[in-house]
Amino acid sequence: MALRQRRWTSALLAGTLSFLTACEGQISDAANPRNPGPGGTNNPPAGVEQPARSARVARLTHAQWLSTVKDLLKLDAAPTALAQSFRADPSQSGFLFDNDARALSVDEALWGAYQRAAADLAGQVATDATKLGRLLPAGSTTDEARAKAFVESFGLRALRRPLTADEVESYLKLYREGPKAYPTMAAFQGGLRLVLEGFLQSPLFLYRVERSTQAADGKVPLDAFEVASRLSYALWNSMPDDALFAAAREGLLAKREGVAAEARRMMADPRARGVVDAYHQAVFDVPRYASIRPNTTRFPNVTTKLAESAAKENTLFVQDVVFGRKGRFADLLTSRDTFVNDELARIYGLTGNFTADFVPVSLDGAQRRGVLTQVGFLASHATSIDPDPIHRGVFLSEHLLCQKIGAPPANIPALPAPNGRTNREVVTSHTEAPGTVCASCHATLINPLGFPFENFDAVGGYRTTDNGHPVDASSTPGIGGQKVSVKDALDLADALATTQAVHECYARHWIEFLSGRPAVAEDDALVARLGKLSQSGQLPIVDLVVEVVTGVGFVTRHPEELP
């Protein structure tokens, strides 16, 4: 009986949802096969900030779904157990982040998981007077009037825009079918349960849909609610709050200063911290920290918790620079101030009574400067016994200079035993021998960026000798199109922090992260402007983010869609 009722309810919901989806057109196919390239036009005007092609329809990531459901239903905690059956969000090759709209689709398995989650959540709320009461607007007298007020208020929040009259009536029809779907429940609660299921299964909830299509001066201005949605998912990874909806309703998001005011308010909200941390975890490759497995015979003073400690340090460090100090990108690369526990203190050579709790410290300025000299980066780019200048160099090239390096040739042999040589000598002889297939990349792009870190061992401890020989950390890497001589990692950190190309790369990552698409030629003018301001010290990270979300490329859309 329960299964038959569930099938009947699903069929009823499917009919209603198909009507509501039809109101928006075909939202499942945003591709236009006539569009050139993956996001950019062929010849955008140089120096002019403009929108790139983007998806009009983008599925919520699983993290966004969780935070949106929590905020929409006003739950005490996100329903993480329900999302465990969601297949993992796919990554897009060459894209650092997990929110690329091109990769976010819905297959049959995920759709089924969404349906089950919607039914579960609707049941939880509709059968709990306290939870349902949080969502019901006050003032209506009859059940029908209360249901209509609920559909209008909840629908605004669920679809991130006001409902049309036809949509309101469609959900009211669904409400009226509640007694048939849930005959054992009171009619009002049963009707709202079915309405909740309908909203939570709607493609207009599961996707962020931008309906604006009217172009002006080669751009499609987004309406106020579309701007609000872009802002909230960029800065909070969730739906707009009441204040942001009010700003949209009152027309405050039609001007740059209104968008900037909301962006600054949102960046001061604790929810922005999670987004800022997620961005830097991807840029600094913090998930790689989980691979830290030092040889305990070689390094007896470290424990299996080193990876966890390193990740915690990175989070505390980034949050302090961005929010505590209102710092700049250069501060991430050069600051000596960080947070340590007892295990990290041992590696950093600090004296004092440290415990498992993290405390703020200033590291030795003769040895440490910025995130690249912290344990997390160094130990995660090392073998269990030796530093790994190759992967350290590749990381800098790709993540900080935005220079992609191709995959290595197949069947490359492992590094040979040192046999009395330093780690640098082994790597050099193995990868830079004239005429070898490796030399072209390693001698110019990889090794020169990795060798300055030879003063740091496999767990990030500072050293001056290697295998009985003095460490040579000098190098001449190419940074921003110029050869720069550095004597060690401290010099390198300073060189990176003062090079505009590095700041442009950091800004480019932010544009990609906040927009959910790869940066393309249309972004170059904004990248150059932000890179210049950041390099000159005039742009704290919070201000950089605000500049991105108030730019023309964020509040308007290219007339052509991203395939």
Regions found by a protein language model. Name each.
Residues M1-L12:
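Bacterial N-terminal signal peptides that target proteins for export
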Residues L13-L17:
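Hydrophobic helical h-region of N-terminal Sec-dependent signal peptides
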Residues F19-A22:
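C-terminal motif of bacterial Sec signal peptides marking the signal peptidase cleavage site
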Residues E24, V48-A52, K70-S440, T444-A501, ...:
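Active-site substrate-binding loop specific to GH73 endo-beta-N-acetylglucosaminidase modules
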Residues I27-N43:
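Short, low-complexity, disordered segments immediately C-terminal to signal peptides
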Residues A58:
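GGW-centered surface loops in extracellular recognition modules
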Residues H62-T68, L72:
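Thiotemplate assembly-line natural product biosynthesis machinery
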Residues S515-P518:
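Axial heme c-ligation environment in periplasmic c-type cytochrome domains
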